[in-house]
Amino acid sequence: MSITAKSVYRDTGNFFRNQFITILLIALLCAFITVVLGHAFSPSDEQLSILSEGDNLAGSAGLFELVQNMTPEQQQVLLRASAASTFSGLVGNAILAGGVLLLIQLVSAGHRVSALRAIGASAPVLPKLLLLILFTTFLVQMGMMLVLVPGVLLAIVLAFAPIMLVQDKMGILSAMRSSMRLAWANLRLVAPAIIGWLVAKTLLLLFASSFAVLTPNVGAVVINTISNLISALLLIYLFRVYMLIRN
């Protein structure tokens, strides 16, 4: 049976609409966790103010030159802020992926599922998911930094890895290798969804300033929730594609 993107989009939309409240609560909870962790591990406002001190940063042409012109104390604060942002984002994304994928599994099995139950059921796979997302994020971002196309291509071919890890209980490297083969063989179904997801995430960043009317923490939760909903929609689509291909 031929799989058409249109039919998968329709199935994805139906599931997203029917489970919207649960998905929204998962997205909101993950956004809250991301913001709280980021706030807890980030430098204080007083420490962050060090980054704007001195004239040594004026005239820096790029990011690398900017970092080189910083004092050791400024570099330490920047490193801590970057690490806090990266860690909180990875934890939030791992919980989101686990929660959404377990929600799909449980609903497909005929169970009524709450957001907390879906996240709780994903607890056993969260450590592996966290490592998987760390590896894939690193590879994709390195590809984006070198040239845009390799980063996008890596995002496409690694798209099935979280699903294979959760659904088929694969190891991290096995899931990545299997995802590369399967996604490449079904590029016409995977590529448009991944590119659309990347564009949506980019547009959200561009419009982030629109949330400036809110307090910083509330604005961060709102932006992260919207971003999580976009990612949840992609996960539902990819899960549906994967199950159709496997069957």
Swiss-Prot record:
Localization terms from the record: Cell inner membrane
Keywords recorded for this protein, A-Z: Cell inner membrane, Cell membrane, Membrane, Transmembrane, Transmembrane helix
Keyword Ubl conjugation: no
Keyword Cell membrane tagged: yes
TM spans (from-to): 20-40, 87-107, 119-139, 146-166, 194-214, 219-239
Domain of life: Bacteria
Topology versus the membrane: Multi-pass membrane protein
Family: Belongs to the UPF0259 family.
Protein name: UPF0259 membrane protein KPK_3195
Organism: Klebsiella pneumoniae (strain 342)
